[in-house]
């Protein structure tokens, strides 16, 4: 069976997350339904990141096996046509044939996320449900400086959800940058893999630094506490975007 690698963009607002669920409309289920209308197959997509409800993606990666050897362009255009007809907020940006050794989740070498904070007094209109609205002025430089304390390998128990199913809380953080562009404060974070709610926990805790309630030492103390109760607030899902997944090629 030929295997296809998909690059997917979606607005996470109307979905219960990536993963198909019995109750609620999921991104995975919507794409699988579009495939069924295209080729008549009941199939299962595997993705690099199982994003939560409300989280967006500009470059999610998934793979799927099809019974027939379709052209990659045909797959992209046909599935997109069915997604449009179903009024889904999902776009298949690219499809390419790959080998059966490629796995969107387990072959990934790095995942890249963006968290957007719209920092202004006026409420959001265009960016509503696309960024976290924070009214109090944020010191992005202080946030960035504090964020560097989190780089490297650590036990990130403080920054993971209590229901996280990962076997170990130890992860290696490769990048955590905070920058400001006008009213927009952006946090970019990269690692091979993440714990449940880890990025949103970083964003919420760094916001505490940005408004002056925490110092960089406070953030480090929270990390070293290895206690979920030491975390700042968990930032809302709609500011979070999966923006890239890296792989080692060829397969």
Curated annotation (Swiss-Prot):
User: Which GO terms label this protein's molecular function in UniProt?
Assistant: RNA binding; tRNA pseudouridine(38-40) synthase activity
Name the source's superkingdom.
Answer: Bacteria
Q: Which family does it belong to?
A: Belongs to the tRNA pseudouridine synthase TruA family.
Q: What is this protein called?
A: tRNA pseudouridine synthase A
The reaction(s) this protein catalyses: uridine(38/39/40) in tRNA = pseudouridine(38/39/40) in tRNA
* GO BP: tRNA pseudouridine synthesis
EC category name: isomerase
* Active-site residues, as the UniProt record annotates them: 52
Its job: Formation of pseudouridine at positions 38, 39 and 40 in the anticodon stem and loop of transfer RNAs.
What EC number(s) does this enzyme carry? 5.4.99.12
- Record the organism: Brucella canis (strain ATCC 23365 / NCTC 10854 / RM-666)
- HAMAP family recorded: TruA
Top-down, what is the taxonomic lineage of the species of origin? Answer: Bacteria, Pseudomonadati, Pseudomonadota, Alphaproteobacteria, Hyphomicrobiales
**Quaternary structure note:** Homodimer.
UniProt: substrate binding residues: 113
Which UniProt key words apply to this protein? Isomerase, tRNA processing
């Amino acid at each position: 069976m030929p295997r296809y690698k998909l690059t997917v963009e979606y607005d996470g607002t109307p979905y219960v997350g990536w993963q198909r669920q019995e109750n609620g409309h999921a991104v995975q289920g919507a794409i699988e339904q579009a495939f069924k209308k295209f080729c008549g197959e009941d199939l299962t997509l595997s993705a690099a990141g199982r994003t939560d409800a409300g989280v967006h993606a500009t470059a999610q990666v998934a793979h799927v096996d099809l019974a027939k050897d379709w052209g990659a362009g045909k797959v992209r255009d046909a599935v997109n046509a069915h997604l449009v007809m179903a009024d889904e907020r999902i776009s298949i940006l690219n499809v390419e044939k790959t080998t059966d050794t490629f796995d969107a989740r387990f072959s990934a070498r790095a995942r890249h996320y963006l968290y957007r904070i719209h920092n202004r007094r006026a409420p959001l209109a265009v960016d509503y449900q696309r960024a976290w609205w924070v009214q109090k002025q944020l010191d992005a430089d202080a946030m960035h400086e504090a964020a560097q304390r989190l780089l490297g390998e650590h036990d990130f128990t403080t920054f993971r959800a209590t229901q996280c199913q990962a076997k170990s809380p130890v992860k290696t953080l490769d990048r955590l940058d905070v920058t400001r562009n006008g009213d927009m404060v952006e946090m970019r974070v990269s690692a091979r893999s993440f714990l449940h709610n880890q990025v949103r926990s970083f964003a919420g805790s760094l916001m505490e630094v940005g408004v002056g309630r925490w110092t960089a030492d406070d953030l480090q103390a929270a990390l070293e506490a290895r206690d979920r109760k030491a975390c700042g607030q968990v930032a809302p899902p709609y500011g979070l975007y999966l923006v890239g997944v890296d792989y080692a090629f060829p397969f």
